[in-house]
UniProtKB/Swiss-Prot annotation:
Protein name: T-complex protein 10A homolog 1
Basic and acidic residues bias: start-end ranges: 7-19, 175-192
Sequence segments annotated as region (Disordered): 1-26, 175-217
Coiled coil: 69-110
Chief place of localization: nucleus
Length: 217
């Protein structure tokens, strides 16, 4: 404004004696100013759509960040739950291994523990069984051998045709008792009775006890 007023007051100052058209510099300046104003107006008209696009992108980025944060939190909680479950399973596995180790150690320390427990389980049903003494073990063997020898003597006398010896109830009772014995013991008793029979064989010409009874009858 001040420059225009000065130019209007002093028109001779802006002109040159050699200028063909005085006032050409002022027109050029006005044209430049008008062009700058038009450029600014165009830029001002283009800015709102860009700003809206930037705002939309910023909002979309915020949404994506919130979604990723939510997913990350869920994954973190799931990982923590899996860690706790893994720790619990490891503790259970250690406890089982410790129990197995204790059981193996106990079985190695007491190999007859199973037999003792089985005996203790049978005691309430059958009562406590005391072991036989040495005399009680030898008496049945002696009785069995004696009965076997008597049976063999009765068989030897019956082979000579004595009906009294065949019908003797004592011999039948002895045979029943001897039949209860086991085969290995019976074989041993037979061998012993044969030896005794050979030693106690009646001499020739001497009557047997059964023959004497028959003669007396």
């Amino acid at each position: 404004m001040l420059a225009g007023q000065l130019e209007a007051r002093d028109p001779k100052e802006g002109t040159h004696p050699e200028d063909p058209c005085p006032g050409a510099g002022a027109v050029t300046e006005k044209t430049a100013v008008a062009a700058e104003v038009l450029t600014e107006d165009c830029n001002a008209g283009e800015m709102p759509p860009l700003q809206q696009q930037v705002i939309r992108l910023h909002q979309e980025l915020g949404r994506q960040k919130s979604l990723w944060a939510d997913v990350h939190g869920k994954l973190r909680s799931h990982i923590d739950a899996l860690r706790e479950q893994n720790m619990e399973l490891r503790e259970k596995l250690r406890a089982l291994q410790l129990q197995r180790w204790k059981a193996r150690k106990k079985s190695a320390a007491s190999p007859h523990a199973g037999q003792e427990s089985h005996t203790l389980a049978l005691e309430p049903a059958f009562g406590k069984m005391s072991p036989l003494s040495a005399d009680e073990e030898t008496i049945p063997k002696y009785i069995g051998r004696k009965n076997q020898s008597a049976t063999l003597l009765g068989q030897f006398s019956s082979s000579k045709g004595d009906p009294l010896c065949l019908s003797s109830p004592m011999s039948l009772k002895i045979e029943r008792i001897s039949s209860w014995k086991t085969p290995p013991q019976e074989k041993r008793d037979k061998s012993l009775s044969r030896r005794r029979q050979d030693r106690r064989a009646t001499p020739t010409g001497r009557p047997t006890p059964c023959a004497e009874r028959r003669g007396g009858v």
